[in-house]
Amino acid sequence: VNRARVDIHCDQVYSMGITGRGIGVAVLDTGIFLHEDLKDRVKGFADFVRRKDRPYDDNGHGTHVAAMIGGSGASMEGKYRGVAPGCSIISVKVLDHRGNGYASDVLSGLRWIRSHKEFL
């Protein structure tokens, strides 16, 4: 992520005060673990695989993707941050513990996002 942040000139954007604050990002993946780097910024969660109410990630990929987008870097003293560390995140679990899923679950997830725009 750090190399990508350099390649896309994140620091120049940050110096203008743009951090992603006020922007909501939906991540349709394997779920999300409420990691220190994502603390207080996960604003919504829906599970179309096991229908659980509380956020979880039984694979790790969804958490990794969310951190690449909006991780604060808090667990590593700011060293590894996402590209938009101020954004809000909505996690929609549409993939199972192996990373497999159904197109119908992805479509259900997209519909859920559309009907919960207030989180974004």
Question: Where do the model's predicted regions map?
Answer:
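Autoinhibitory propeptides
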Residues: V1-M16
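Short acidic, glycine-rich surface-loop motifs adjacent to enzyme active sites
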Residues: L110-L120
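Subtilisin-like serine protease catalytic core
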Residues: Q12-G44, K52-S104, L120
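Short, well-ordered amphipathic alpha-helical segments that serve as non-catalytic structural scaffolds
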Residues: R5-I8, S72, L107-L110
